[in-house]
Amino acid sequence: MTPKFDIDYVLANITEDDKIALLSGSDFWHTHAIPKFNVPPIRTTDGPNGIRGTKFFAGVPAACLPCGTALGATWDRDLLHQAGVLLGKECLAKGAHCWLGPTINMQRSPLGGRGFESFAEDPHLSGIMAKSIILGCESTGVISTVKHYVGNDQEHERRAVDVLVTPRALREIYLRPFQIVARDAHPGALMTSYNKINGKHVVENPAMLDIVRKDWHWDPLIMSDWLGTYTTIDSLNAGLDLEMPGPTRYRGKYIESAMQARLIKQSTISKRARKVLEFVERASRAPVSADETGRDFPEDRALNRTLCANSIVLLKNDGNLLPIPKTVKKIALIGSHVKTPAISGGGSASLEPYYAVSLYDAVVEALPDAEILYEAGAYAHRMLPVIDRMLSNAVIHFYNEPPEKERTLLATEPVVNTAFQLMDYNAPGLNRALFWATLIGEFTPDVSGLWDFGLTVFGTATLFIDDEMVIDNATRQTRGTAFFGKGTVQEVGQKQLTAGQTYKIRIEFGSANTSPMKAIGVVHFGGGAAHLGACLHMDPEQMVANAVRVAAEADYTIVCTGLNRDWESEGFDRPDMDLPPGIDALISSVLDVAADRTVIVNQSGTPVTMPWAHRARGIVQAWYGGNETGHGIADVLFGDVNPSGKLPLSWPADVRHNPTYLNNMSVGGRMLYGEDVYIGYRFYEKVGREVLFPFGHGLSYTTFHVSPEATVSPIVFSSDSPPTATVLVKNTGPMAGAQTLQLYIAAPNSATPRPVKELHGFTKVFLQSGEERSVSIHIDRYATSFWDEIEDMWKSEEGVYQVLIGTSSQEIVSRGEFRVEQTRYWRGV
């Protein structure tokens, strides 16, 4: 148990240097300690879908939960609370007091690189999901850090871009999830975003930080994103408590100089130090492990499997193709995702998982008597798959000198694969600013033939196989998108190899500062990184032909493909909505021979184009499903779980249909949020544009009936007695299942332009076959309100409001109405 300390006593007795030290991290993950006064260091940890601990490189394995959009697709408060509890327990096992999550930025564009981390395109759904997972996490004693406040909705030039957004859109869309969290969850910490809002970086923007503390009366610790502090004076005076990570770049001695010039008040330093101490005192109560450990328990696996299965959205099921009967004799599994599951996106979401269940293994388990045919059909990777199971006796040696000089070995680390990220790695005597490393290992291919090798690096790297240079990614480099946008493109080499023969692999690596490449708008964490991948060289046409052959002879075919961490990651945005090259052609070719018995399973965190959707009878959206990806998908495909997921974002047929199409990247250092409040379904409905699948859509293996008239009581809205909408819902189908009833509010007679309707409530109800239940959804004052830019306040406008209850944004099944008799204004939560 950490000894307690008295905040007032500490502040009254510590030195000025101690106060200043508290205002920045001590290293990559920890706050400063003051041992003399029993003030301990607090450990923070990523990420949005699992708890990595303190090491990007050679980290302790962890539970990997489904990605943010997957969790949002459950529309299930209770499940999100349980997910939060699991994340909290994982933090405790990693010795971490503070979880750097959840992410609640908005998916204004389907191309956003971190779109998979957030819950939804709708601010109400996003806020409620965030509230639930935060309350779960903080019930364990771990502090949650909701992020990124605000406007980090795309990755392009994220540190430099000026997001130009109207006050109304800012309040109604982008701040609203944070406001819900502030009102209902009160998490202990808030992380600022990298970007500017309307001309000034959020981290040093008093108007933005005052909204949190003055408008919402929420007083969390406010920390910067990593290397997201840009000034000393402005950030401190605006209200930034903690600069992360350490060692400091803008505080320390710079604060002393600013205080001497009376540009920062002594009272400001004391105020910020008090907030850090309040955070430390609260966080230190968490019963964290002394060491970083794992906790891979059966009940956690079961929960993760439930989360994955309940997130899966049945997009299309013509002729009840699904579920596939377990009596099937021969089934074809096609797609590179079948054996290599996409369990998470990239960037801060990256971690070393306890395990990952592939769809192939799950199908073998579910169908012990079936003949299973497998073909990759087409590769979905952007970078060649990392070498792991065919690698042995691999280590990395670290030096302060390059290979051509006499050098001293400083450290040796064992590795299990050929990818490493060294941003937070250190060793005694290592010069973090400039060092070199050599990875050596033994590679034993399982197939003879010509092998492709791909090497991507942040720094410099050269690949040797049996001392023959195969790839040079050091002398000439081309910028790519890997490693938070700092890496090179993948350089490819080839070598003829024999199955079963062992080859010596050697990578000569130079740290980040050995690279001549520089970039604007990306975060330079230092250290460097490399990714070596390999696979047997294949003829794309032959791969498709092999897939078509097995599909033609199988009773059922599952094509499982999509995106992965190569395509969706922190550090870059997608250039388009397309699936990887060759995937659409593969799917179309399979449908040519087996459309009546083929189901397409897509794994992605955000929408992809589906030019073949009209031909497919069955389409399943499986997101990034975490450790239990394969089990979760199989549970739905074979009917062990009745799908209940609903899309948390609209699915456009074409990226050009999206309202952000002309404004989704930094141009001249700024990005215009020209769609204003018309994000996602709000836009598509306002302009009457069809989508491939609407917001809130998701099918079931059973059917439901909802009473067509919603009872709304009281009929007159008042702040003392807000109305509730009640309907009867009945499971009229053959099996138990869940339906999510979505409450939308329309203000058809408003004098102010408003969306056709907006989500302001939902509930998920589980019913046995034949069961009927009365379901109520509460309506709060924000359901009738918009941000009045003239008055600079919320405005609840008098008039009649329609209550529309749907099973998606386009399937309205029940209606009612109420009225507001008097216009009201207010600020706050």
From Swiss-Prot:
Keywords: Carbohydrate metabolism, Cellulose degradation, Glycoprotein, Glycosidase, Hydrolase, Polysaccharide degradation, Secreted. It is found in: Secreted. The keyword Transcription regulation does not apply. One of its GO terms (cellular component) is extracellular region. Pathway: Glycan metabolism; cellulose degradation. Beta-glucosidases are one of a number of cellulolytic enzymes involved in the degradation of cellulosic biomass. Catalyzes the last step releasing glucose from the inhibitory cellobiose. This is Probable beta-glucosidase H. It comes from Aspergillus fumigatus (strain ATCC MYA-4609 / CBS 101355 / FGSC A1100 / Af293). The gene is bglH.
